[in-house]
């Protein structure tokens, strides 16, 4: 949807600067590009690694109760079935019958009108699953289907017991990792913000059930203060409290930042209850 805080001219300048100075390039550019995928250049990868190192120091190296993990991108597909991703990780999509453009319904100002050409001749909205599918092994059939992970938290839940035993941790403690995630976005846009391959920095904190909200409030405050220490001003940062929760959440907030395209989520803090355990 349109955002009154958006500045398209500034966004255009930012994209041009990033490419010209070697921060971010369109992937596969000499072959026409590949929508939703970006490569980090010499300065971009330095900046990216610096951000990751700062986050890792804050979340892992300075805490005795947070352990690290580096899990695989592809795992047993049963994990994604159990987590609800195969059945519920989707967005509503509609197609314009006039210009053939495809749109995510919740990003349209008017869900009855095509934002590309203005036509009202649209298909009925339908669920579009965001999981990227592949095959493992020499046979391409349903029994060998696998998925690129859509988020980095699920392997943390799967390896929870192994990490706890190996690190000799007791509740409460957390597991953090930095790694790639993949989502088959209907309409990639806003530069690297809404892309199909991206890096996530994630920490899952485990505690007794009755202490869930206490720790949710603790981490909410910790993460807000982290961005304040980095220099984010109150004018350019706000907290969005979710009223409509994801299938796994008991409470959730987003830390939003004012980007050139408007307000967008930089980080989420979610109370997942016992959904994944």
State the predicted function of each range:
Residues 2-277:
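TRNA-recognition modules of translation machinery and tRNA-sensing kinases, especially anticodon-binding
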């Amino acid at each position: 949807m349109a955002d009154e805080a958006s500045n398209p001219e500034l966004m255009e300048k930012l994209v041009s600067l990033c490419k010209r100075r070697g921060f971010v390039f369109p992937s596969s550019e000499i072959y026409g590009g590949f929508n939703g995928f970006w490569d980090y250049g010499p300065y971009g990868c330095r900046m990216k690694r610096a951000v990751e190192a700062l986050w890792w120091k804050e979340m892992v190296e300075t805490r005795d109760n947070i352990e690290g993990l580096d899990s695989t991108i592809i795992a047993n597909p049963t994990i994604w079935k159990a987590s609800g991703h195969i059945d519920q990780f989707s967005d509503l999509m509609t197609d314009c019958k006039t210009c053939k453009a495809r749109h995510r319904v919740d990003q349209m100002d008017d869900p009855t009108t095509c934002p590309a050409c203005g036509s009202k001749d649209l298909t009925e909205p339908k669920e579009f699953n965001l999981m990227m599918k592949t095959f493992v092994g020499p046979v391409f059939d349903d029994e060998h289907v696998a998925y690129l992970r859509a988020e980095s938290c699920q392997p943390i839940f799967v390896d929870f017991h192994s990490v706890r035993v190996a690190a000799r941790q007791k509740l409460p403690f957390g597991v953090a990792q930095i790694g790639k995630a993949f989502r088959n976005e209907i309409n990639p846009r806003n530069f690297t913000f809404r892309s199909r391959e991206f890096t996530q920095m994630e920490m899952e904190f485990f505690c007794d059930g009755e202490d869930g909200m206490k720790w949710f409030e603790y981490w909410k405050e910790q993460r807000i203060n982290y961005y304040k220490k980095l220099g984010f001003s109150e004018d350019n940062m706000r907290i969005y409290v979710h009223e409509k929760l994801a299938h796994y959440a008991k409470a959730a907030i987003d830390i939003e930042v004012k980007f050139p395209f408007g307000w967008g989520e930089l980080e989420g803090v979610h109370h997942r209850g016992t959904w994944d355990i």
